[in-house]
Regions:
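Domain-level signal for Mg2+-assisted phosphodiester chemistry and nucleotide/NA-binding surfaces
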Residues: 1-88, 128
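Nuclease catalytic cores that cleave nucleic-acid phosphodiester bonds
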Residues: 53-158
Length: 158
């Protein structure tokens, strides 16, 4: 059986905070990878995270690498007014568009509605786009435009 080639894009911060908010639990990256790789040939897999420089985060990032993710880090920026910045929306979008030509499917793990434009663009290129997100915390706009929406439920949690 020939498996479809897939690009996997994980917005680590979004997944962490939505899983914690909804379930007070963490996402199970190992189970997620097993489920995907059973049905898909994972051509590229990126996990986008913020680097705060602490050891616990480095250990987690190394676990992601061991699973098979290419971990992309952006420094955590604390502004003078106390607010913080550290999102990967542009980086995820650029990687999605760069690698879409190599794959049949794109798997996006994020509930961020800003990605609805990206999902539409990928579908316009003939790609199947599956979005994983936490129910109630995933923007309706991205659920509507996705080829398929997969709710992150307790089966995908630690």
């Amino acid at each position: 059986m020939v498996l479809n080639k897939a690009l996997v894009l994980v917005d680590v911060q979004n997944v962490y905070y939505t899983c914690r908010q909804a379930y007070k639990r963490n996402f199970n990256y190992n189970r997620f990878w097993r489920e995907l790789s059973y049905n898909l040939d994972i051509a590229h897999a990126f996990a986008y995270a913020i680097d705060k420089g602490d050891n616990k985060q480095r250990e987690f990032q190394n676990i992601l690498r061991a699973i098979g993710f290419d971990v992309k880090l952006k420094p955590f920026i604390q502004r003078a007014d106390g607010s913080a910045k550290g999102d990967w929306d542009v980086g995820i979008t650029l990687d999605a568009l760069e690698h879409a030509g190599d794959v049949d499917e794109v798997i996006l793990v994020s509930g961020d509605g800003d990605f609805d434009i990206l999902v539409n663009a990928l579908k316009g290129k003939g790609k199947t786009v599956t979005v994983y997100g936490v129910p109630g915390l995933t923007a309706e706009s991205i659920q509507k435009v996705a080829s398929k929406y997969v709710p992150i439920d307790t089966t995908l949690l630690l």
